[in-house]
Amino acid sequence: MAKTATEKLRQNKATKKVVLDKDFAGIKAGQRMLVGTPQMMDAYIRKIPFGETRTMQRLRNELARRNKCDATCPVSTAIFVRISAEAAIEAMELGADIADVTPFWRIVGPDDKIAAKLNIDSEWIRQQRALEI
């Protein structure tokens, strides 16, 4: 049986720092790339203050800088942000209060590609953002 997003989020994974031997996703060969974890993305999102939003680009830049890297892997970042968002949605479906889940709508915009993949209407994301203005 496939793991739930909550199970994926709880898996202990180590961050990796990789020096690229060839260009990858806009990151140049020779640059140091951070490959984060679902927990790292979740922790970052939880720290975004009420009423504020962030872009994926800002998330990647800040995490790279904090970890002394040139860039953060955009592919794994998108996957791990999605895991964090899906775990929050699962928790709400099980009755968790919105105040107790990771506020993924602060990083995932209603028109983002990730939003289209989530099991929640993008209008809901739009409404959550509007409630925090």
Model-inferred region functions:
Residues 2-5, 13-133:
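Nucleic acid-binding interface residues in structured DNA/RNA-binding domains
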